[in-house]
Each structure stands twice: as structure tokens, then as C-alpha cells.
Amino acid sequence: LRKEPDESEEQEEIEDEKKTIKIFPSQEFYSTNIDIPGDFSSASFLIVAALIIPNSEITLKNIGINPSRTALLKVLVEMGANIKINNVKENIERTADILIKTSSLNAIVLDEKLIPNLIDELPILFIASAFAKGKTIIRGAGELRTKESDRLEAMSNALGNLGVKFQSYRDGID
């Protein structure tokens, strides 16, 4: 952060044939504290790991929980996840501590309306679904084929390498 120059302050000019550079006198800079929350998409991997690893209990502190980014939490809770949101703070972005405990997950039929708010977390949801009881159905996720890489194909390959039984479709996985 810097103080804007006062119009009365003198400017020093350096000129050559093509360019002019204006240099203002020394200015005061002020420090400030900035609290940068943890990224929810990055936290999602730890959330799912805690859910599926026996006897796990972790708290992820100061994670951004903007409602447009946390659809995965709603889906996991619907699957039976033991997740608690604590210490909610209203900053520039809403943040909270997320407590996760090992849980027995159940399969779901994912509502396609949730896909736009889950697009970055779908690969980790596939992993959670592999540990759920029953058959999870995910459709409407064709956008994953056009991201930086074909994430549906990559996840299909990864799930196959792990021995997970699934069926891949152009817009999702069962």
C-alpha cells in the first residue's frame, strides 16, 4: 500500500527521444495485516482423506467457505460424512475451521444442478464415492472433458488402476 502523490509534489522527469519516465519523491508505505484463507479446492483432498482413513480426525483452520465453492461439503454430508463447521468469520471472504472425522459414506445420485459448483472437486468426489456403500451416479459433468486435460478420462484411468469397479460415460461416472 502506498500513499498517492500530492499534486503539489515535484516530479523528476527523465526523457529520451521516445519515452518519458516520471519519478515521484519518496513516499510513505504502510503495512497492514492480511489474512489469506486456505483454498477450499485444495482442502477437499484432505477432507476426503480424513473421511476414508480409519480413525481420522482433523481440523482444517481458516478455510474459505464461500457458498459458491462449498457444494462438496453438502454432497459429502448427504453421503453421511461427519463434518462440522466451526469458528465462522465474515472477512472479505467467509472463512471457518472444518472438523472432519472418519465416516461411513453412502452412495448418492448426484443432482446435476450441483455440477457447476462442484466442477473442480468432482475428481476427489469420485474417490469418496469409491469408498461409499452402493453405486454413486454422477451425470452432467461433461465439462471435465474440456478442462486443461480430459479429467473424466484421467479419473477413469486412476480408478481403474486402483481396482475400482465403475462405468464411464461421456458426461459422468457410475
Task: Enumerate the predicted regions with their spans.
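Short, structured segments at the rim of ligand-binding sites
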Residues: 1-174
